[in-house]
Amino acid sequence: MFDAVSDLVNAFTSINWEVIFQLLSVALIVIAGPVVIFLLAFRNGNL
């Protein structure tokens, strides 16, 4: 029982969270560009 719990904890602690957050930040920035273009087109250039 405790081996399974410790394996689960080790799986989460071995994940490199910094890389995940950096990739998430880049993804949000990349997605934000087309969203702004779509809003500009939808509102006829009036933000």
Curated annotation (Swiss-Prot):
Please list the coiled coil stretches: none
Q: Where found in the cell?
A: Cellular thylakoid membrane
How the protein sits in the membrane? Answer: Single-pass membrane protein
Which InterPro entries does this UniProt record tie to the protein? PSII_Ycf12_core-subunit
Q: Which UniProt keywords apply?
A: Membrane, Photosynthesis, Photosystem II, Thylakoid, Transmembrane, Transmembrane helix
Q: Which GO terms describe its biological process?
A: photosynthesis
Principal cellular location given in the protein's record: membrane
Any one GO cellular component localisation term in the record: plasma membrane-derived thylakoid membrane
Q: Which domain of life is it from?
A: Bacteria
**Residue ranges crossing the lipid bilayer per the database entry:** 19-39
Q: Which cystines does this chain contain?
A: none
Query: What is the annotated role of this protein in its UniProt record?
Result: A core subunit of photosystem II (PSII), probably helps stabilize the reaction center.
Subunit info here reads:
PSII is composed of 1 copy each of membrane proteins PsbA, PsbB, PsbC, PsbD, PsbE, PsbF, PsbH, PsbI, PsbJ, PsbK, PsbL, PsbM, PsbT, PsbX, PsbY, PsbZ, Psb30/Ycf12, peripheral proteins PsbO, CyanoQ (PsbQ), PsbU, PsbV and a large number of cofactors. It forms dimeric complexes.
Q: Which family does it belong to?
A: Belongs to the Psb30/Ycf12 family.
Q: What is the protein name stated in its UniProt record?
A: Photosystem II reaction center protein Psb30
The species this protein belongs to is Nostoc punctiforme (strain ATCC 29133 / PCC 73102)
